[in-house]
Swiss-Prot record:
A molecular function (GO) term: L-cysteine desulfhydrase activity
GO biological process, one term: L-cysteine catabolic process to pyruvate
Family from the record: Belongs to the UPF0597 family.
PANTHER family: UPF0597 PROTEIN YHAM
InterPro entries for the chain: Ser_deHydtase-like_asu, UPF0597
Pfam families: SDH_alpha
Name of the protein described by the UniProt record: UPF0597 protein Ssed_2537
Species name: Shewanella sediminis (strain HAW-EB3)
Length: 424
């Protein structure tokens, strides 16, 4: 395999992984589980300090297996029942009595949550004590990237700053572009990318769960009912919207099923996966074609998002759906140029959508961006593309750089304002 392709696969392996529950509160649960594993008995108290952006994305989302919302329950149940070896699936095996004990710890005033000033967008510091022992766990630069652990004031683990790999810089030093991603996805050995089919399996199960049960705003179930009631047609576009939104409903509603995440986001993993899976079904594509399309979608999304900070004020589902549209064109037999048209079309459509935290209404944003992907795909296969106007440039790479500039230089104050509004 080419060195460049090996780098691409390493990127995918690093940030396309199963995650149970919204990754921001799960980050706190993971840190707490590690802290608890360092103690000889169950923690008596837990304090959590997080970055503004991690705080924002934890305020309104259900923690799986608990039926409850927020960082406090995530940290408490992580400390009492979390599996420190399970990464983003830290809460996969929690039980009802552990949730009750976690809530009792909160009710007793032994769990605290606060914001802390830091340059890192993804940052979580947990302090736990039991008896005479006090432990701390610090996560920085990635949802599971532990950079320091202490026991009774002594450092027992530390990762040098120069050795840390922040997800924000995951494409740094890599020869990567939309053209390179397209070539990799269409030419690499199927056996080297077969693993991405797990995304189809996990996120399809999550969609089925969201359609079968009541989660969040029930966006997917509402589309399903509207189709059955004759208000909407059962067609290619609406079925994609229904299944994609339903998975997000379940994800945000605390379903105890993992999503295959993308770049730290389960919703974006859903948006990168299900429109592609549904398109593959429509065109009766085999597993190899589906895998190639999923690689195109997931890696394309990662590449575009690497141009701006994670957990910013910009809703990442927008650019994720742009990459999904690119992959949909591929499955329809379109050309590379038409795939680029699809990206341009999405970028011109809904690239102004803001992130105001993870919550049940994310399912509506997933539906919106996915709808944009479907429209962009339909235009692109007719060789229709947005022209060089506004933030959309003559070529797709220039447009992607423009998006990065918009978010990095133009939306910092937006992010601060959103967090201030949410915290008021």
């Amino acid at each position: 395999m080419k060195h460049q392709w090996q780098q691409y696969q390493a990127i995918l392996n690093a940030v396309v992984k199963p995650a149970l529950g919204c990754t921001e509160p799960i980050c706190a649960a993971y840190a707490s589980a590690i802290a608890a594993s360092m103690l000889t008995s169950e923690p008596e108290s837990v304090s959590v300090h997080v970055s503004d952006n991690l705080y924002k994305n934890s305020m309104g989302v259900f923690v799986p297996g608990t039926g409850k919302i927020g960082l406090a329950i995530a940290a408490a149940v992580g400390a009492i029942g979390g599996n420190a070896e399970a990464g983003l699936e830290v809460l996969a095996t929690i039980e009802a009595d552990q949730v009750e004990r976690a809530q009792a710890m909160i009710d007793a005033g032994n769990v605290s949550v606060s914001r802390t000033q830091t340059d890192e967008f993804i940052y979580c510091y947990v302090k736990a004590h039991s008896g005479d022992d006090v432990v701390t766990v610090e996560i920085s630069g990635g949802h599971t990237q532990v950079v320091e652990k202490t026991l009774n004031g002594e450092i027992v683990f530390a990762k040098e700053v120069s050795a840390t790999t922040s997800t924000a810089g995951i494409c740094d030093g890599v020869d990567i572009s939309i053209a390179g991603i397209y070539d990799y996805a269409t030419q690499v050995s199927f056996e080297d990318i077969r693993f991405i089919l797990d995304a189809s399996e996990l996120n399809t199960k999550l969609s089925a769960e969201g359609l079968a049960n009541e989660y969040g705003l029930q966006v997917g179930r509402t589309i399903d009912k509207s189709i059955k009631d004759g208000f909407m047609s059962s067609d290619f576009a609406n079925n994609i919207l229904m299944h994609t939104a339903a998975a997000s409903d379940a994800r945000m509603g605390g379903a105890s099923l993992p999503a295959m995440s993308n770049y730290g986001s389960g919703n974006q993993g859903i948006a990168a996966t299900l429109p592609v899976v549904m398109t593959a079904t429509h065109y009766q594509a085999n597993d190899e074609l589906l895998a190639r399309a999923l690689i195109m979608s997931h890696l394309g999304a990662i590449y575009i998002k690497s141009h701006y900070p994670p957990l910013s004020a910009f809703c990442g589902n927008t650019v994720t759906s742009a990459a999904a549209a690119m992959a949909m064109v591929y499955l329809a037999g379109g050309s590379y140029q038409q795939s680029c048209f699809a990206i341009q079309n999405v970028m011109s459509d809904c690239s102004g959508m803001v992130c105001d935290g993870a919550k049940s209404t994310c399912a509506m944003k997933v539906k919106t961006s996915t709808g944009s992907a479907v429209n962009a795909f339909m235009l692109a296969i007719q060789s229709t593309a947005a022209q060089a106007q506004g933030i959309v440039a003559d070529d797709v790479e220039h447009t992607i750089r423009n998006i990065g500039q918009l978010v990095t230089l133009g939306m910092g104050n937006t992010d601060t304002t959103i967090i201030d509004i949410m915290s008021a």
